[in-house]
Amino acid sequence: MTTSPGPVHETAATTDDAALTFRGVDHISLTVTDLNVSAKFYTEVLGFTVVLDFGYGLACIHKTTGFTLSLIRHADGTGTRFSQRQTGLDHLGLTARNRAELLGWEQRLRELDVEFTPVRDSELGHHLNFRDPDGIALEFYAPNDRFAAALDELRSRTFSDEDLLDVAEQQLGLGAYVARRSS
């Protein structure tokens, strides 16, 4: 195993798969055609703050959530609009508290002349879809009460993979969609 040198307090990663995990999503980097236009959108519409400017890219922080968004303009980029039908990113989903908050976001998007699809309800919750200036698909999502309760239970303790599938099947009533693998 190769490890890179680091601070003295760091230790080499273990090969014990049970000990290896990640703690959440750290950041996302989006390729854009115009840094200024994209920075304006993400600061004015979603409340990000541009913190670093590398010339070719910007690092933006959302102060409330701590989420980091990088906007990158590649010198040799194609300049074409985003399509979720190509391999890669389908959309970026952002968390909302509930359906009422989504309706508030509808109003904000309307006031800022951002095109959106009205709030839609699904088996697991509610979503509001819109796009950034490059056509990158964005979504605000709020789980319904049943899914929120299941997520709270999942976060409260450790589950085996089989237990996790049981929660999806029983608590959410989504047995037809549960991805059970035959042994």
Question: Where are the predicted features?
Answer:
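A generic structural signal for short beta-strands and their flanking turns/coil linkers
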Residues: 56, 67, 88-90, 112
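Catalytic cores of nucleotide-enabled group-transfer and carboxylate-activating enzymes in metabolic
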Residues: 41, 69, 104-106, 114
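Vicinal oxygen chelate
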Residues: 2-18, 25-33, 80-183
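Core segments of cupin and vicinal oxygen chelate
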Residues: 19-20, 30-75
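Short beta-strand/turn micro-motifs at beta-sheet edges
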Residues: 14-18, 77-82
